[in-house]
Amino acid sequence: MKTNTDLFEKVPVPKAVATMAIPTMISMLVVVIYNMADTFFIGQTQDPLQVAAVSLATPVFMIFMALGNLFGIGGSSAISRALGEKHKERAWHISSFCCYGALGLGVIVAIFSVFGMEVILRLIGASENTIGFARKYLLIISIGAPTILFSTAFANILRGEGAARESMVGNLLGTIVNIVLDPVMILILGWGVTGAALATIIGNIAACLFYLQYFLRKKSTLTISLKYFKIGGGIARGVVAIGIPASLNNILMSFANIVLNQALVGYGDTPVAAMGVAMKSNMLVVLLQIGLCVGIQPLIGYNYGAGNKKRLMQIFKFTGIVSVVMGTILTLLMMAARKTLVQVFINDAQVIAYGIQMVIALQLSAPFLGILFLCINTIQGMGKAIPSLVLTVCRQGLIFIPLIFILNHMFGLEGVIYAQPAADYLSIVVAILICTHLFRNMEHRNASVEE
């Protein structure tokens, strides 16, 4: 598409970043609302145990989304580089592979999750008080896993070809359906967590149908035709090489949340509910910064594939400045509204007290968190699988999880609460070091070519 080619190659950097990032940020804002909806309406039941159950189940839902990102982020990176290299048919093979790969893995995940439900419930730290609610919620989410993987994957695939607006519309449609159904199913029909899960899956089905019609009406330069499905020729390897680090990041994040919840359970169900509410509130800050950085990944990938290193660096620097400014503004807003944000979800005195402290703790690293996501998405956009994997493992595996145990042992509940911002700052340092190394290598290669 000529318009998308101009966007990647010629449009001024601020406008190109805005064109790609704003729809993605709106999509992430939609994800924030989407994730808050279940907790908000469950909170209106004034039952902390149901709120805690949904909080405990959230990491499993995030793992399903992470597996969708295996094909979504991996496919988006591979597609944008293929288009930058003018290999259009290769991009078709990639999009078809991602379509059927996401659906196939979704079916496998659904089967294993349903039959392994009791094991999962114990792993996420469900107590005798919350296990019944968590089981009801997760059973429906597990059955709907194929729709979660597909909608997550193709929200990213569309961005890979520059169709950020269409990606946003699909996300928005799914969220609107979820939000409309939540109060009906949770409160009016009195289905509680079961209603929340059903609304979530129906919302995902709506998003899937939108993405399918986008391809079937041939609005895309890509295809999901089965005749272009291909695993060999580096297609699967190219997607998985970037997709695994990207999905591993979210899987480790979910696993870290499980470890965090297990540490909090030692202090009762109330801190678990409070942390769930605090993290939902903090999603506004985190996901808007992720949206900015995910939005520019196709620009990075295309210009890296096209060999335009100067434009790549301009995009990186401009996005870095925007992320810090935006992160600072969002942090100030969160600090000012911290009590209101917690009360919106549930009006329980103990949950509110813990929740306010947790919101404050999570804001300590928020102004600079965008730098971490910028480095991650730049590395993924460049197709650097090993550095991406290293950074991913460092962030959630080697830093956050050990800090939970260490700080819990040293400072008790206070230590658990402040483990996240401490891990964030250490991760930012590692990310900057890795990106600096890659940029220096890129400059050396350019100098060698010129000589």
Give residue spans per PLM region.
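Residue-level hotspots within pore-lining transmembrane alpha-helices
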Residues: 30, 34, 64-68, 108, ...
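Short alpha-helical transmembrane segments in multi-pass integral membrane proteins
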Residues: 1-21, 79-146, 188-244, 300-365, ...
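Small-residue-rich hydrophobic transmembrane alpha-helices
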Residues: 51-111, 148-167, 274-332, 336, ...
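Alpha-helical transmembrane segments of multipass membrane proteins
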Residues: 36-40, 111, 119, 153-157, ...
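N-terminal transmembrane alpha-helices
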Residues: 8-40, 44-45, 59-74, 78, ...
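Short runs within selected transmembrane alpha-helices of multi-pass transporters and secretion channels
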Residues: 141-159, 167-175, 196-209, 290-293, ...
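Helix-terminus/linker motif at the lipid-water interface of multi-pass membrane proteins
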Residues: 29, 33-51, 121-128, 184-191, ...
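Transmembrane helical elements of multi-pass membrane transporters/channels
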Residues: 19-38, 140, 174, 203-207, ...
